[in-house]
Amino acid sequence: MKTIHITHPHHLIKEEQAKSVMALGYFDGVHLGHQKVIGTAKQIAEEKGLTLAVMTFHPHPSHVLGRDKEPKDLITPLEDKINQIEQLGTEVLYVVKFNEVFASLSPKQFIDQYIIGLNVQHAVAGFDFTYGKYGKGTMKTMPDDLDGKAGCTMVEKLTEQDKKISSSYIRTALQNGDVELANVLLGQPYFIKGIVIHGDKRGRTIGFPTANVGLNNSYIVPPTGVYAVKAEVNGEVYNGVCNIGYKPTFYEKRPEQPSIEVNLFDFNQEVYGAAIKIEWYKRIRSERKFNGIKELTEQIEKDKQEAIRYFSNLRK
């Protein structure tokens, strides 16, 4: 996949861009709804013998336009989003820098410069996609703005539990600890990436060594508690349990940030500094304070057995 980063005004020459069918959207999470949009564009591209292109934007428009209701943390930071869009068969990805100048374009200017001007023959987007200043351009106005110079297709919404599959729906699920629902909406396990860092090394003294994780990006971290997870380290994938929390059994004063600690099953390596990817599967329980090490270790063993049963049933 060819990735082209654009800052407005772009200086790309139309004739040098491949004739394409383009899917447009912010695509945070690259969830099932987004996959339907890109999949629709792919099908049309194959039928017409054209290149499959995707256009996304960075940073999130709400960060630029000051809509505080949007969270700062993303389901998929840009690097992860690019990788997932590539996996869907995209041939060319345009990453447009979203800034105030770009946001001030009229709908017609956006179409002329970023659709027609990039040699797009057919545009595809979800029913709620908007473009141009104040989001005044919609999928209903797009045919008029295209003025016969390109076609367009609107993709209807996908629903789950009678609710539209959306990035905000997934963010809410993750913030509530409902990683199972989030995974259904995403069409794959939610994951975060980080580096194994030094912790207080207490886990190994009680028989449950853990890898402490420092995050690479501003991911949405599920709420405190214990989760069944899979973790990829050094190219190998292991089942495990992850504790997100403040370790109230050991700390009277609550630390500023919760720690992310993973106990991997059948794993006994020193991996400080290694990259780690954690996939979240099920919330086992909330965080609690125990009356000593014995009670804590007994509960950790129960958590481990529950995770083992969960992954055993998952394979059936």
UniProtKB/Swiss-Prot annotation:
GO biological process, one term: FAD biosynthetic process
Residue ranges crossing the lipid bilayer per the database entry: none
Stored SUPFAM superfamilies: Nucleotidylyl transferase (SSF52374), Riboflavin kinase-like (SSF82114)
Keywords: ATP-binding, FAD, Flavoprotein, FMN, Kinase, Multifunctional enzyme, Nucleotide-binding, Nucleotidyltransferase, Transferase
CDD domains: FAD_synthetase_N (cd02064)
Known EC number: 2.7.1.26, 2.7.7.2
Molecular functions per Gene Ontology: ATP binding; FMN adenylyltransferase activity; riboflavin kinase activity
Record field: catalytic activity: riboflavin + ATP = FMN + ADP + H(+); FMN + ATP + H(+) = FAD + diphosphate
Pathway: Cofactor biosynthesis; FAD biosynthesis; FAD from FMN: step 1/1; Cofactor biosynthesis; FMN biosynthesis; FMN from riboflavin (ATP route): step 1/1
UniProt cross-references to NCBIfam families, sorted A to Z: cyt_tran_rel, PRK05627.1-4, PRK05627.1-5, ribF
Role noted for this protein: Catalyzes the phosphorylation of riboflavin to FMN followed by the adenylation of FMN to FAD.
Family classification: Belongs to the RibF family.
Protein name listed in UniProt: Bifunctional riboflavin kinase/FMN adenylyltransferase
Organism, as annotated: Bacillus subtilis (strain 168)
